[in-house]
Amino acid sequence: EGYREFYNVVRLAESKAHSTPIFHGELAAFRRSLLNEVGGFPTSIGADDSHTATMIALRGYRSIAVDNAWCVESVPRGGYHKWRVRRAQHLIQHFATTLRHLTKASSGLRGVLLVETHLHLFNPWILAVATTILLYLAITGSLTALTLLVLGTTLLVYRPYRTWITTQLYLVIATIRNLWTREIAWGKQAKAR
């Protein structure tokens, strides 16, 4: 619930700013003429719904999450973490591919794309590097570093913070996995509501 609640708030905010570059395929509608204009769904990246919506938005249209639509998504019964890592892999592929199109984006869309690109490609590594530096400093006697690490660990009881940290871990793992497998196709998972 924590991730999905956060996800929905961000997608709606991006939609109000201009367009959202991230979709979950359980409920997405595309105008056929626009699908044809962008060449349909890409087969080279896993987040085909998100990438197609972004390519449409780059042509001056909008890709939005609707605040009054209701959709129930089934989640995997087993392999939930693998599912989250795969989804993270696909979004990393999407934003890495979208980087070269940033100059074509309108200012509203460019802002959204820059923030999401930073959050998916760079932010997880900033956290990993900062944590590594703090660990080193704490081991070598820095009371400030130790205090920050204890504070960060204690904050894990706060659900939004825990959700953010977990998401950063999925993104780091996904980036590493993308080095040897892009996992464009995968087996169907049994899902529960």
Language-model features and meaning:
Residues 2-7, 42-112, 166-177:
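Catalytic donor/gating beta->alpha subdomain of glycosyltransferases that bind UDP-sugars
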Residues 75, 157-159, 181:
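Short helix-capping/hinge motifs at transmembrane helix termini and TM-loop junctions
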Residues 77-147, 183-193:
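Basic/Trp-rich segment in TM-proximal cytosolic loops or flexible interdomain/linker regions
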Residues 17-21, 176-193:
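Low-complexity, charge- and small-residue-enriched intrinsically disordered regions
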Residues 1-39, 43:
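Long helical/loop segments within the catalytic core of UDP-sugar-dependent glycosyltransferases
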Residues 91, 125, 151-163:
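Transmembrane alpha-helical segments that form the membrane-embedded catalytic/substrate-channel core
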Residues 15, 153-155, 170, 174:
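N-terminal membrane-anchoring/stem segments of glycan-assembly enzymes
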Residues 113, 117, 146-151, 160-163, ...:
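Short amphipathic alpha-helical segments
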